[in-house]
Structure formats: C-alpha cells, structure tokens
UniProtKB/Swiss-Prot annotation:
Protein name per Swiss-Prot or TrEMBL: 16S rRNA (adenine(1408)-N(1))-methyltransferase
EC category name: transferase
Phenotype upon changing R179A: Decrease in kanamycin resistance
Stated consequence of mutating E88A: Decrease in kanamycin resistance
Species the sequence originates in: Streptoalloteichus tenebrarius (strain ATCC 17920 / DSM 40477 / JCM 4838 / CBS 697.72 / NBRC 16177 / NCIMB 11028 / NRRL B-12390 / A12253. 1 / ISP 5477)
A GO BP entry: methylation
Mutation effect (R8A): No change in kanamycin resistance
Keyword Ribonucleoprotein on entry: no
InterPro entries: NpmA, SAM-dependent_MTases_sf
Effect of N138A: Decrease in kanamycin resistance
Length: 215
C-alpha cells in the first residue's frame, strides 16, 4: 500500500494495516476521496472506527493527510489513513464495514453506473458481509451530459431500481434505497465538490444510493 503523508508517499505493509485495523471496531472506506475532507470529518466524529480514504490523485490529499498525521493537539487523527490508489486496483484491504463513493467522476463514475462490474466486485471484495454502502451521484453530470455517463440516462429513484439494482446485484451489492438528498444533507457530505458546485447553482441535485454488500 502507498500511504500519503503530506508530499511524501510511504510504503504501508499489509501487516501494518492489519495491526492498525485490530485497534478499531470497524473500517470505513472512502473511494475517490478527492481532497479528503469527507473522511477527515468521519474520522473525527467516530474515533472508534478506522477510516481509510483513497484517490488516484495523491496531490489532492497532501494538505489533509499532513494534518491527519500530526499530533492530536494539532488536528491529527490516528484513526485516519490516506492511500494513493485507484478503484480499479484497490490495495489489499479487508473487513470494511461501510463504503462511501461520493461525487464520483471519470472511471469511478462509469463504474458505479454499472459499466464496470469488475470495479464493483473489487470494492465488494474488501468488504465484510453485510457492509453498508453510500453512493452519492452529482446529477449535474447529466446537465448537460459529460462523456463519463455514456448512454446512461440521468438516474432517478425509479430508474435506479429498474436498471441499476440488477447490475449491482450481480456484483454482490443490494440496493435498498434511492432518494434525492435535501440541501442540508448534501452540505453534510463535507466534500469540496458539493461546496464548489452548490455555490455556482441555485439548486444542486444529488441522488443517494444506499444498501448492503455481500461479497
């Protein structure tokens, strides 16, 4: 594993991860974390849970990862780990009890729309049976459509149940609920994408998909 600590990238062995994981009640994984502010909030609010955040662009995690690695008096969080990795090639994690994919873009967006069953199965493989998931989709990716959405129409709660749920099920994901988030819920995600996009629009629509994973 490649751990990001500020501008440095450190090797983090499987044994080191298992030793760290053993100190906490559960593991939360945030895939495509961007600047990493969402997992920082989760880790701060849940000191008994290990939070792992990863992104393909290590530079975006530099600032927050340095803060997380500092002493607790300076904002450090010992239960937070930032990794440089892609959703296509996840590090050898295990025991994840909660999976977050918020405002995905690029190949990650294509994957959670069902275009890459391998990606969905890969994320399921690092989860324990019964793990929960939250996928939050920025619907403005369809207004107008960006190349990543391909031929997928803008999802709605009804259409997600119709065409996305079966694709998820094939990969071990059981879609239980699909709904639009209220403005305060969007703000509560604590991501730079939500703040940036919301500030440029009178209305910012996010569709949340939740359920469980049984790899």
């Amino acid at each position: 594993m490649r751990r990001v600590v500020g501008k440095r990238v450190q090797e983090f062995s499987d044994a080191e991860f298992e030793q760290l994981r053993s100190q906490y009640d559960d593991v939360v994984l945030d895939v495509g974390t961007g600047d990493g502010k969402h997992p920082y909030k989760v880790a701060r609010q849940n000191p008994s849970r290990l939070v792992v955040a990863l992104d393909a662009d290590k530079s975006r995690m530099e600032k927050i990862s340095a803060k997380a690695a500092a002493k607790p008096a300076k904002g450090g969080l010992p239960n937070l780990l930032y990794l440089w990795a892609t959703a296509e090639r996840l590090p050898p994690l295990s025991g994840v009890g909660e999976l977050h994919v918020l405002m995905p873009w690029g190949s990650l967006l294509r994957g959670v729309l069902g275009s890459s069953p391998e990606m969905l199965r890969g994320m399921a493989a690092v989860c324990r049976p019964g793990a929960s998931f939250l996928v939050a989709l920025n619907l403005h990716a369809w207004r107008p459509s960006v190349p990543e959405v391909g031929e997928h129409p803008e999802p709605t709660p009804d259409s997600a149940d119709e065409w996305l749920a079966p694709r998820y099920a094939e990969a071990g994901w059981k879609l239980a609920d699909c709904r639009y988030l209220e403005p305060e819920e969007v703000a509560g995600l604590e991501t730079s994408w939500t703040r940036r996009l919301h500030s440029s629009r009178d209305r910012f629509d996010v569709l949340a998909l939740t359920g469980t994973i049984s790899p």
